[in-house]
Every structure is written in C-alpha cells, then in structure tokens.
Amino acid sequence: MNDVIKDEYYDTIATGYEELHREEQEKKLSLIKKHLQVKASDLLLDVGCGTGITSPFNCRVIGIDPAMKLLERNSLLLKVQGEAEHLPFKDNTFDVVISVTAIQNFHDIEKGLQEIKRVGKGKYVLTFLKKSAKRETIVRFIKEIFTIEKEMEEEKDILFFCR
C-alpha cells in the first residue's frame, strides 16, 4: 500500500477503527504494561497513537499520528498531527517512547526509528505486525539503532523492549 493511500485509509476507517482494533490493541497494551515500568512523573510519547487505545498509562502522555481523523477521536489532552520521520520535539525529551503496531506504516522505517531514538531518553517499546512484508527490514533497523532488552511475540505482533 503506498503512503498516500495508507494515510487516506486511516482517515477513511477512523469512525470504525476502535471497533476493528480495540480488543487486539488492548491485549498488546496489557502485555506491554506487564513488562514496562512507568512512573507517574514520566513523560511518554505514543508514536502512531491513532485513537489513543494504546495511550492510557499512569503518566503524562503525548500522542502523535499522521491521520487527523484518528486524532479527532483521541481523548488525549496533548496530541500532535505528524509523522514518525519528523518528530517535532527536542532531543531526549521523553522518558518513554512507544510505537504500537505502527512501524510497518512508516514512510521511511530507518528515519522513523532514528527519530524515536533521538527524542527518547532510553526506554522504548516498539511493536509491529509480524506478518508485515517489511519484517526483516524493521528488525534489522531496530537491532542497529536500539539495544534490545526483551523480544516477545503475541498473536499478531512482535514486541521489542529496548533502551
């Protein structure tokens, strides 16, 4: 799916996104929370936050997503329309950066992951669809850019807990 069609796709399905994906995303979120320590004082960035299903952490959260119609359905107080490849934040801003089932949609996977690393302070959770045609590329760049502390597979995704 080319990038323009992909962006339009998420705007088109925005009204039914949660019905399609809520249960699946909440399972991933539960697994992430079991393995990720977050303090109330932490600042967390959710890259590819969509409607905010994966954003409910007990800390300060900012979400970023390119699909405006998904963001309109997101209840986060702080949300930004934007892309992973051009994160509008200073270096080392976020205590935690997560990206749940979004990496396979990045226009430039390497650049998006480099940006995630740049804005984070050292705690990252990265997941992507394990059936993605870009799987080998994504894994290669995650291994080049981050230090992997834990790798897990669940029903549909591969999860990396990194620093």
Give residue spans per PLM region.
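Conserved beta-strand signature within the Rossmann-like core of class I S-adenosyl-L-methionine
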Residues: 122-130
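Class I SAM-dependent methyltransferase SAM/SAH-binding core
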Residues: 45-86
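Short catalytic micro-motifs in class I SAM-dependent methyltransferases
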Residues: 101-102
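Conserved class I S-adenosyl-L-methionine
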Residues: 1-37, 155
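Core SAM-dependent methyltransferase catalytic element
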Residues: 153-163
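A short glycine-rich, Lys/Arg-flanked "PGG" loop and its adjoining helix->strand segment in the class I
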Residues: 110-123
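A conserved beta-strand element that flanks and buttresses the S-adenosyl-L-methionine
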Residues: 98
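Short alpha-helix
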Residues: 132-145, 158
